[in-house]
């Protein structure tokens, strides 16, 4: 069976993530990488939930065959260890800071073989509000200190 890889850098699983997982399942056995706390801080922000909690949330969707740690933003180690046939990601990484990560995936796919499948980004007002509240909460040092 083909190996399908996607990676999440999130505390909340929303409609867009579920769309990605459902699309990934069409192509084979789904591996979901969860960025470790260190990787999230380096890339995006301080996580609101622990790494273990974030892994459990993805497992509980029932849409992932394997949930694994992704220690780095770039996918080199993913390709060395999992050797995915497909990488599935939202198409929101074509521009902005994530463009570099996409380039890394494309380079690895050329090297190892495989295909990139980009799912149309899910724009949702509820998700925007959740993200804004999370960023606001994480801006408070007393909250971060409890972690």
Residue ranges: model-predicted function:
Residues 1-147:
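Nucleotidyltransferase catalytic core that binds NTPs
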């Amino acid at each position: 069976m083909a190996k399908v890889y996607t990676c999440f850098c999130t505390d909340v699983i929303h409609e867009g993530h579920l769309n990605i997982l459902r699309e990934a399942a069409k192509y084979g056995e789904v591996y979901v990488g969860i960025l470790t706390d260190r990787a999230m801080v380096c890339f995006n922000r301080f996580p609101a939930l622990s790494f273990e909690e974030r892994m459990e949330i993805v497992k509980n969707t029932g849409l992932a065959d394997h949930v694994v740690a992704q220690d780095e933003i770039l996918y080199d180690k993913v390709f060395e260890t999992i050797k995915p046939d497909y990488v599935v990601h939202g198409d929101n990484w074509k521009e902005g800071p994530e463009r570099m990560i996409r380039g890394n995936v494309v380079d690895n796919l050329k090297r190892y073989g495989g295909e990139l499948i980009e799912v149309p980004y899910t724009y949702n007002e509820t998700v925007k509000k959740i993200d804004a509240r999370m960023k606001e909460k994480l801006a408070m040092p007393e909250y971060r200190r409890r972690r």
